Amino acid sequence: DWSSDVCSSDLGSGTLALRMTDDGTMFVGGTNRGWGSRGTKPFSLERLRWTGKVPFEILQMRAKPDGFELEFTEPVNAETAAQLATWKFTSYCYIFQSSYGSPEVDHQQPEVTKVQVSDDRRTVRLTLNQMTRGHIHELHVAGLKSAADLPLLHDSAYYTLHYIPRGE
């Protein structure tokens, strides 16, 4: 049985195929395909059954003209969420080239200059001093808890900013 806090490292091998049945059971087929992968097995077939328990997570990250808006699965602790030090960004991109792979290049450190927590405490709007089109914006969240005092299951989020929205 599983709740949504099952991570790829909890599975036997790298996930390759998923199948959801009518009763909500998920079958996960995995292989490392001769490469390094999460898990300790070269192949796996696992059955997961949903327990109905949703963890405290970042549900969505949306680009705004001056930053990002985060939606959470539960209300946040407004006091911690309002602190600038809770939110740390870095941004970077990769070299487009014909050979395989690329190092991260053009690292930048956007700073959060303003935090707005919605009345229902499920949405947090972060204003940044800079955003770079074409960059991956990597967010790390330090010490944020839900209003029910639960920690974030995953304290990072990534957004590839293909364009900066207008308006709002």
Model-derived features with residue positions:
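Short, small-residue-biased leader/transition segments that mark boundaries at the very start
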Residues: 1-8
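Beta-rich catalytic cores
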Residues: 12-14, 41
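Residue-level detector of Asp-centered blade-edge/turn motifs that repeat once per structural unit
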Residues: 20-23
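Conserved beta-propeller blade signature
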Residues: 25-29
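A short loop-to-beta-strand structural motif that recurs across blades of beta-propeller domains
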Residues: 44-46
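Acidic, Ser/Thr/Gly/Pro-rich low-complexity segments and short DxT(G/T)-type signature motifs
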Residues: 52-60, 77, 95, 132, ...
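Short, surface-exposed alpha-helix to beta-strand junction/turn motifs within ectodomains of secreted
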Residues: 71-114, 139-146, 155-159
